[in-house]
Amino acid sequence: RSYAQSNRLAHLLRDISVLTRMEEAPNMIETEPVNLTTMMRNILNEVTLELEEKQITAHNMLPEGLTIQGNSSLLYSIFRNLTDNAIAYAGTHISITIRCFREDERFYYFSFSDTGVGVGPEHLSRLFERFYRVDKGRSRKLGGTGLGLAIVKNAVILHGGTIFAKNTPGGGLEFIFTLSKE
């Protein structure tokens, strides 16, 4: 039990540190070309055991070689936190789909969706608040810090984008977000 609590505290400190860095020095963030397709493939490889345990099927539908100019650490945080959330909260025997559904001269448009349980409509507007939890008891048991989606939102904003969440008609949750090409 003490190991679990110290582990949770370590995750909390890490998440607070990431948020603080984003807020205090947004202009100090270094950028480089980042291949999002490869990054997402690597993330799915990292969580293979969790996916298998919950019988979750993941579909990385990002086009081969999709590369943007960005901060690799923050971009990783976006895709990893969305993946971790789907695994932790969407349920078992579901699927996760990541795709880039549109591109224009300035942005790539992404959808990160699952076929899980979704969330009550009253929670949708608050999902990105720090420490907000839809189900406080379950979140604590699963080890979440309540900062993952706040990190996602801030990282998306620092990459010139926007993000929102919606329930899907067949059940599940979908995050729609944009990332600037530059």
Residues of each region from the PLM?
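Short helix-loop "hinge" at the ATP-lid/N-box region of the Bergerat-fold HATPase_c
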Residues: 86-87
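Short alpha-helical segment of the dimerization/phosphotransfer core of two-component systems
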Residues: 4-9
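Conserved glycine-rich
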Residues: 92, 160-161
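Short beta-strand/loop element within the Bergerat-fold HATPase_c
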Residues: 93-106
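Conserved catalytic submotifs in the C-terminal HATPase_c
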Residues: 30-33, 52, 57-67, 103
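Short conserved segment of the HATPase_c
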Residues: 119-133
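Acidic ATP/Mg2+-coordinating residue in the GHKL
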Residues: 114
